[in-house]
Amino acid sequence: MGLCKCPKRKVTNLFCFEHRVNVCEHCLVANHAKCIVQSYLQWLQDSDYNPNCRLCNTLLSSKETARLVCYDLFHWSCLNDLATQQPPNTAPAGYRCPSCQGPVFPPNNLVSPVAATLREKLSTVNWARAGLGLPLIEVAEPVDDTMSHDETDYRDWSVVNSSSDNLSETPETTSQTGYTYNSVAPGAVQQSLNGNMSQDHAVTIRDTGSESVPFNAASSPRKVYDTRENARGQDAVIDFDDDKYRRRPTLNWLARILRNRSGSKSRPASSMQRFLVILIIGVLGFLTLILLMSKLGRASADNDPNLDPLLNPHIHVGKE
């Protein structure tokens, strides 16, 4: 175990054989991408290392490298060629490390910088995307333009020449086509926009020598927007300056609650709110009535002569 020299200062058991320092996985990906890195115990057992790729026996620093989760390092091109030679139906577990026979694909629950870098590199090739559960990349097949531009079939030229001669012999006749557009007058359109619903109008295209084809505006895909609803909505929310300082009635808030402001589209909770307000008002009115009746009853009892003990003949006060 050792302490990495990076600002993270993480405790790690990885050791770079080339620089002879302890490295964490963050430094391994960032600064030691082409170095031989294994555990510190392996360094203590044998400090010798091979700086060449074990697949092509060339220096690892000469090409792009790929580090597996077992920390074995290979040229990415060599590892890709080796995996491409496998059958297309090879299972993900069939791809093994050439050095330690460990898995090439990192486990799904492994979260580390080395595993993330390896997944990103494996996602660029189709054989690895299938093992990672990703959709395959569509490779465009090259189109072979082997047809020679000099090869021409001259067998049908006689037919073309004969047809061109027949066309030249026939007199050229042209006919002009007339178009007639019938629509509603501008005054009627203005009237329909002001108060009435927009009426259907028809467009008729007449061709000289052919029958007329009517087009009905009601069947056209254009939408007809009624701007009167928007105008009514704007009038309802307009707040004039004169109304800002007008004195509101005392029970205006109660009228707003009891009034259905949304018309037919009432909210589900509006009926419940009205019921609660009416219930509270009823309880307050009942309590007020009880309090008023109690005060009036006590006042009438104080002035009642029948309840005065001095006026009762059966009560003698101050007599033996």
Swiss-Prot record:
Gene3D superfamilies assigned: Zinc/RING finger domain, C3HC4 (zinc finger)
GO BP annotations listed: vesicle-mediated transport
Mapped zinc finger ranges (B box-type): 1-43
InterPro entries: ZFPL1, Znf_RING, Znf_RING/FYVE/PHD
UniProt KW keywords: ER-Golgi transport, Golgi apparatus, Membrane, Metal-binding, Transmembrane, Transmembrane helix, Transport, Zinc, Zinc-finger
Cytoplasmic side of membrane: 1-274
Chief place where the protein resides: Golgi
Zinc finger annotations (RING-type) as residue ranges: 53-101
Membrane topology (UniProt): Single-pass membrane protein
UniProt GO cellular component terms: Golgi apparatus; membrane
SS bond partners: none
A GO term for molecular function: zinc ion binding
Compartments where located: Golgi apparatus, cis-Golgi network membrane
Transmembrane segments annotated in the record for this chain: 275-295
The keyword Transport belongs to this UniProt entry's keyword annotation: yes
Spans within the Lumenal topological domain: 296-320
PROSITE patterns named in the record: ZF_RING_2 (PS50089)
Coiled coil: none
Family stated for the protein in its record: Belongs to the ZFPL1 family.
Function text: Required for cis-Golgi integrity and efficient ER to Golgi transport.
Protein name: Zinc finger protein-like 1
Organism: Xenopus laevis
